[in-house]
From Swiss-Prot:
Protein name from the UniProt record: Protein cereblon
Compositionally biased spans, kind Pro residues: 180-190
Keyword Zinc: yes
UniProt organism field: Drosophila erecta (Fruit fly)
InterPro entries associated with the record: CULT, Lon_prtase_N, Yippee/Mis18/Cereblon
Quaternary structure and partners: Likely a component of a DCX (DDB1-CUL4-X-box) protein ligase complex. May interact with pic/DDB1.
Domain of life the protein comes from: Eukaryota
GO cellular component entries: nucleus
């Protein structure tokens, strides 16, 4: 091939490449002009046709909470409603809210230019919600009327440009956000507790005029008794203290002399086994102190004793929640559930005269190895079910929580560990329903390696590390307390919360403080403005720690750290965002 033919071929190839580049540039420019036109049209429509008067501006949830409004509760109820009307608002679109990553743009041509398909809107709001989670102001700043719709518009069209300017492979990598790794827990500083932990356990906020009610009666396992019953919003385990305020007439007629009254408390949240759906599980409680409140109510302190089960057919009347000032009595037959405990396998091996070496610390390991050599059981199996090894591992895990009241009785220890190790709700139900102490301890042992967080129950924002729990009461890190209105709060004490996790409501106060010498201040989830607990700050100079937090069990849940991703918001948050936008655009 000569030089002239070669140059002619190269010239033709160069012209082809120029034509392809020109066509690509024209197509790219057309896409950009189309997106810009849609953006400008929607912006003009919002500004010219849909601008609400200033008095209809979005309100700050924190401000609403401070005014005593019920907006957060309304948001929760609204979020629990069905979305079908919202999803079907644009019949010409086949893209639902459940497919935010769809790349089908065919509907964009059929819809008016200022209308955006729901899946595009959902994707933009989802991204904004995830970004607001880690910023100051949280959802309150996100709902700022001055720039809310503008930010939604910008997010929608920035995502649209990203889809149109990249290839299919690159777009897939761009749209799919990598999962955030679990948050690394900051190093825990040493905690110095200069506070009498007996005071919260005594519930001294009730006053000093309470009188002792003697008598602690354990009922025979398997026996059936007729007693007064109430309901409770939290799960109580035997050994826990339940303080409450109630009309004294509910108990006085049934108070048998000097013996403490025993009554039953059922837990509606305790899901019964599938084969026993018509049963209510709970505990017996015995009153051990009482005193007048001065407002027609009586303070009572009671302690949970034994697990019980109630058949629905045996309930006489309508049971009421003990924390909601019940006005009528309800009685039922209750059955006392058993607690089975089997000693360690090696304890059943009779070593004769050598048994004296078992209690000598220097000979204990040698004695154990000799025992193992006389049995057919592998050493790993014996170690797996060793009660002593579970106790030691639990002691090491709780060492940083400043707890020195671990019981020695296996039955009491199994319930005590459930309260202080903070298991998930599913695990708590499993441990409560089992009659075997050994099985309960094995379930608890399976959670020793879990890294857990406290999450807001309403929006799933992470609030605190479970490893930051510590005991401000001799009963442990989780205790039931009663507020002045009679509502019972399950409170978990932590010495710190995550940055940008909380806001405040109202003013601090020292009245009816559960921790004498500390003032309390209501804290809210900074993302959804729901009440999640209290901040306690020392008002006396000699108390330590100076600041700690109490998380309300009804407002938080416990989950694994791996759940804490950037897109872990509750669906109702995004759904309500979409409804707000839709209302503004109608």
């Amino acid at each position: 091939m000569d030089d002239e033919e070669t140059s002619e071929i190269n010239s033709v190839q160069g012209r082809d490449e120029d034509v392809q580049l020109e066509d690509h540039s024209q197509a790219q420019g057309l896409q950009d002009r189309r997106v810009d036109a849609m953006e400008q049209a929607w912006n003009n429509a919002i500004q010219d046709e849909l601008s609400p008067p200033p008095e209809e501006a979005f309100q700050d949830p924190l401000a609403i909470e401070g005014e005593g409004g019920n907006a957060p509760e309304a948001m929760v109820e609204d979020g629990l409603q069905d979305d079908t009307a919202s999803e079907g608002s644009h019949p010409s679109s086949d893209m639902s809210l459940e497919s935010p990553g769809s790349e089908d743009d065919s509907d964009l041509e059929r819809l008016p230019r200022w209308m955006i398909p729901q899946n595009r809107l959902r994707s933009a709001v989802d991204m904004m919600v995830s970004q607001a989670r880690n910023r100051d102001g949280g959802i309150a700043a996100l709902l700022n009327r001055d720039n809310f719709l503008q930010r939604v518009r910008s997010m929608v069209f920035s995502q649209e440009r990203r889809r149109s300017r990249t290839s299919e492979e690159t777009s897939q990598e761009d749209v799919e956000q990598p999962e955030d790794p679990p948050p690394q827990q900051p190093p825990r500083p040493p905690i110095d507790i200069g506070f009498d932990t007996n005071l919260p356990a005594e519930h001294s906020y009730f006053g000093n005029h309470l009188s002792r009610v003697p008598g602690v009666d354990y009922l025979e396992v398997g026996s059936v008794h007729h007693m007064l019953i109430f309901l409770h919003q939290h799960i109580l385990f035997p050994g826990e203290v339940l303080p409450f305020m109630i009309d004294g007439r509910m108990f006085d007629e049934d108070m048998p002399g000097l013996d403490g009254l025993i009554f039953g408390v059922g837990f509606p949240l305790m899901q019964p086994p599938e084969d026993n759906q018509l049963k209510l599980y709970g505990v017996t409680c015995q009153i051990y102190e009482k005193g007048e409140s001065g407002r027609g109510l009586v303070f009572y302190k009671s302690r949970a004793l034994q697990r019980i089960v109630i058949n629905f057919d045996d309930i006489q009347g309508s049971p009421q929640y003990i924390a909601r000032n019940p006005t009528s009595k309800c009685f039922s037959k209750v059955k006392i559930l058993p607690e089975y405990f089997l000693p360690e396998p090696l304890q059943s091996v009779d070593m004769g005269s050598m048994a004296r070496f078992r209690d000598i610390p220097s000979m204990r390991d040698k004695y154990r190895r000799f025992q193992l050599s006389t049995t057919n059981w592998p050493s790993d199996a014996c170690q797996e079910y060793s009660f002593a090894s579970i106790v030691e591992r639990a002691r090491q895990r709780l060492e940083s929580q400043k707890i020195d009241t671990m019981p020695k009785c296996p039955i009491q220890l199994s319930f005590w560990l459930v309260r202080n190790l903070h298991l998930t709700e599913k695990m708590m139900r499993l441990t409560f329903l089992t009659d075997s102490v050994n099985t309960r301890l094995q379930l608890i042992k399976s959670t020793f390696t879990d890294e857990s967080l406290f999450f807001c129950r309403y929006c799933n924002s992470s609030l605190a590390h479970c490893a930051d729990l510590f005991a401000m009461s001799k009963h442990g890190v989780q205790t039931q307390y009663c507020n002045p209105d009679g509502y019972i709060h399950e409170t978990n004490t932590v010495y710190r919360v995550m940055s940008h996790a909380i806001g405040y409501s109202g003013e601090p106060s020292t009245k009816f403080s559960w921790f004498p010498g500390y003032q309390w201040h209501i804290i809210l989830c900074k993302f959804c403005a729901q009440h999640v607990g209290w901040e306690f700050k020392a008002v006396q100079p000699n108390l330590t720690p100076r600041v700690f937090f109490g998380l309300a069990g009804s407002s938080v849940r416990i989950g694994k750290a791996s759940e804490n991703t950037s897109f872990n918001g509750s669906p109702y948050v995004v759904r309500n965002m979409l409804r707000l936008i839709s209302n503004e655009m109608e």
